[in-house]
């Protein structure tokens, strides 16, 4: 029996755009506009937005809110495979992460940085495989101003006499980004949630 939450890596899909977003913000190209025609042809392969939607001239904020594959592919190709690879590594992608209850693994290899692999990796497809738990850890690090914390199973253990015998502890795993970068990504995450009337954040 494998737990899908932390033992079964899968293609992360658009949630991986959080990783690409880090590099977009850190490179200072978030104000640049991309012409989104609904698809992008790379090495003879046409890759489309979900539903084939075209969004016209969009910057980082609108590209994130619309979840534009074309925008993120374009930005990843501008940044280059090495930067995208380093972004993934900053979130411990491709590493074995030892937790109290399991070791979580992911597959993250840009395979010599071919353009089609770079482009599809940018929006969570390609060869990338990640567990839902690790994607939650990536999201948590953004919410926590760039500090990724180690998950633990329990807050405390209390015996029959009401005495606490063991406590879970917060432990920092890695710094993934600067607080200013995290704040900018949090801002577009809020905008995305509110644009779909999912919540008011």
Predicted segments with their positions:
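Beta-lactam-recognizing serine transpeptidase/beta-lactamase-like catalytic domain environment
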Residues: 1-14, 19-201
């Amino acid at each position: 029996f494998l737990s899908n939450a932390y033992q079964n890596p899968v293609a992360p899909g658009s949630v991986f755009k959080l990783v690409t977003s880090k590099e977009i913000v850190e490179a200072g190209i978030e104000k640049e506009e991309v012409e989104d025609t609904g698809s992008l042809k790379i090495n003879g392969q046409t890759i489309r937005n979900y539903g084939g939607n075209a969004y016209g001239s969009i910057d980082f904020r609108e590209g994130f809110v619309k979840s534009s594959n074309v925008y993120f592919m374009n930005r990843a190709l501008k940044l280059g495979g090495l930067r995208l690879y380093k972004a993934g590594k900053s979130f411990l992608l491709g590493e074995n992460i030892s937790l109290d209850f399991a070791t979580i693994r992911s597959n993250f290899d840009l395979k010599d940085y071919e353009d089609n692999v770079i482009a599809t990796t940018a929006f969570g497809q390609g060869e990338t495989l990640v567990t839902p738990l690790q994607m939650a850890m990536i999201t948590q690090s953004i919410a926590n101003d760039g500090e990724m914390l180690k998950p633990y199973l329990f807050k405390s253990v209390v015996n029959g006499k009401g005495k606490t015998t063991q406590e879970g502890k917060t432990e920092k795993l890695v710094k993934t980004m600067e607080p200013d970068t995290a704040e900018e990504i949090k801002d577009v995450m809020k905008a995305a949630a509110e644009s779909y009337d999912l919540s008011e954040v």
